[in-house]
Design a protein with these regions (language model features):
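A short acidic, helix-capping loop that chelates divalent metal ions and anchors anionic groups
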Residues: 35-39, 128-134
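Conserved alpha-helical substructure of the radical SAM core
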Residues: 1-119
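Glycine-rich S-adenosyl-L-methionine
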Residues: 135-152
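Hydrophobic anchor at the start of a short beta-strand
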Residues: 95, 154-155
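Conserved phosphate-donor/acceptor-positioning beta-strand/loop module used by diverse small-molecule
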Residues: 122-124
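Gly/Ser/Thr-rich helix-start
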Residues: 73-74, 127, 137
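Anion (oxyanion) recognition and catalysis
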Residues: 89, 151-154
Length: 155
């Protein structure tokens, strides 16, 4: 979706929850809350394509540029995650990933950047003791380490 007059258009942001899958069990997460007994679910590739093109159509109708915030659970765990990023790249759509840092390394971050990832949003829930209580022991230090991977990739 190459735009020649992009300076004149405003972005319309879509926050897109593509999967409930996550290998963390953060205390405050709605997906795994005690009253939520459903099995984790993910969108199929067909649903993802339909949603993607519906969002593009919406933006055409309302003269906006699409921008996606891809989230989940942890979106990188979706089996079609990289395929979706390929679709974003093919259409030159800017996107941000909202996920946890546990599956990031220099190679993954380099790939994210190559596909066009502009930002990677992760959480710090306070200082070490508070963050590790909400998430899991050691996660504060892992998060800080993974911020380095994100920075080195230029995200």
């Amino acid at each position: 979706m190459k735009q020649n007059n992009s300076a004149a258009k405003q972005y319309f942001a879509f926050q897109w929850h593509i999967t409930d899958e996550c290998d963390q069990r953060c205390k405050h997460c709605y997906i795994f809350s005690e009253n939520n007994c459903k099995r984790p679910d993910s969108m199929s590739w067909e649903q993802m394509q339909e949603t993607f093109y519906n969002c593009l159509d919406f933006c055409r109708v309302y003269d906006r540029l699409p921008c996606f915030y891809i989230t989940g659970g942890d979106p990188i765990l979706h089996p079609e995650f990289w395929k979706l990023l390929g679709l974003m790249k093919e259409h030159e759509i800017p996107f941000t990933i909202l996920g946890n840092p546990f599956h990031l390394n220099d190679e993954v971050c380099r790939r994210l950047k190559e596909y066009g990832c502009q930002k990677y949003q992760l959480s710090l829930d306070g200082l070490r003791e508070t963050h590790d209580w909400f998430r899991k022991p050691g996660s504060f230090d892992i998060t800080l380490e993974k911020i380095g991977c994100i920075r080195r990739a230029g995200i």
